[in-house]
Amino acid sequence: MIKNLSQKESADLLANNYIGYLGYIYKDCPFIVPITYFFDGKNTIILYSSEGHKTAAMRKNQRVSLQVSEIKNIDNWDSVLAHGVFEELSGNDAKRSLHEFATGIKHLILTKEEKNLHFIGEFSSKIYKDEIPVIFKITIDEITGKNRIH
């Protein structure tokens, strides 16, 4: 049976994971790409990326989504979809958010996978030599979720 998740269940699913699928529009065409994220438990998803296609697209159309799933098998899964607005961060806001992102994901990996990581490059490969990453957030407008347990 498929049922709707409550707002709390949806937020918990988002908070207990760190890999999702970012949806955005570029030239009237939808794109979906895997991305590492951190949900602050309130209303904000923190992400970062190298400069490129998706960052250029999101600067033009700030409406985005993030989908996260936990799939055990065909009869046992949870899925959440968060819709929101892209905002690029800079200066101290970007530094603070990147620190929160790294600290939060390291804690999740330690809790879920029992791995103690020390550097952001151990769980995310978006920072390349001499390249400044684009730090951004999604302010959530709406979050919905579903699950199936047979």
Regions found by a protein language model. Give the residues of each.
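Short, structured patches in soluble enzyme cores that scaffold and shape functional sites
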Residues: 26, 68-70, 139-142
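Beta-strand-connecting loop/turn residues
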Residues: 42-44, 62, 141
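Short beta-strand segments
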Residues: 17-50, 66-67
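Charged, gly/pro-rich active-site loop segments
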Residues: 78-150
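Short, basic/aromatic recognition patches
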Residues: 1-20
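Helix-adjacent hinge/juxtasegments
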Residues: 54-87
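Surface loops and adjacent helix of pleckstrin homology
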Residues: 50, 69, 148-150
